[in-house]
Amino acid sequence: MSVRQESVGQATAARSRARAVAPPEIREHRIPTQGSKPYIAMEGFDGGLWFCESGTSKIGRFDPKRASFTEFAIPTPNATPIGITVGGDGNYWFAEKTGNKIGRVTPRGEFTEFALPTPNAGPDGILLGPDGNVWFSETEVSRIGRITPDGTITEFKDGITPGGKPLSFSQRDGALWFSEAAGNCIGRIAMDGTVTEFPIPSHDSQPRATIAHPDGSIWFVETSTNALGRVDRAGKIVEYKVTTPNASLRGVAVGPDGDLWFTENFANKIGRMAPDGGMLGEYEIPTPASGARCITAMSNGRLYFTQWDAGLIGEVIPR
């Protein structure tokens, strides 16, 4: 499949003039347990924000209406949970990077854990697939795993760049798309395990978070090259520079307005980009050096992001 080789500079010059937007309000909520190091977060079945506490081996839930937290301790100590997703069974599934397990937790906080067949696989990203199974990345061994609701695990390695370090997933066209942080590409895995890779034009871009856009494209952050990338339906990749140099982009989400909202770890800002690549703004996070990581949009029209270093959940209210 062909890949559009358009540089970051070309894409920046080609974008339309960005529209004027009002800055959002940013609020912060402190997680009760000190040293929680929140990582991936997503909206649950109940309208709460469910997230992994990588520093304290817990699964957290934030109630947006009451601004309150509930925390559930994972049975395995020092499991380092990273990714979390809703399952087709009404439960939540998560990846234990150090524990080398896939965990399942009910809405009431009851846990089941499944050990991975490959030692030190380093499971990271995780997402419910269109086939009803949960898929996850095995970052340290460059494989993609699949777990059925009853706990049967299958691993796929063919077609993935050796040492590519797959990370984040998004769903499109009946398949899952994923980033390869060391492989410098975006991958696509069909439900039969067939993998296709799409090289990113910029060298050593370190793609991380991905998100599916309603227009059918897949967006991703490039941590090393300070840009957002876009994969269209034909597999062509275009990259768009962000304004602040060396911002260290980590998470990306599609807001209720269709814009791309993203976290800037080093710059300690929340960025906003139009779907045509035009920068709309960058907004300071109140807490300095907060360690902004994942950002996710919720059905209440707001976005929430994790602050790994500060132990906070950030709330973005677009205006």
Predicted regions, residues:
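A short beta-strand motif characteristic of beta-propeller blades
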Residues: 27-31, 70-74, 111-116, 153-158, ...
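Beta-rich, blade/repeat-based domains predominating
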Residues: 34-46, 77-89, 119-131, 161-173, ...
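Conserved beta-strand positions in repeat-built beta-propeller and related beta-rich domains
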Residues: 51-55, 92-98, 134-140, 178-182, ...
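A short loop-to-beta-strand structural motif that recurs across blades of beta-propeller domains
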Residues: 58-61, 100-103, 142-145, 184-187, ...
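Short loop/turn segments that connect beta-strands within beta-propeller blades
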Residues: 63-67, 105-110, 147-152, 189-194, ...
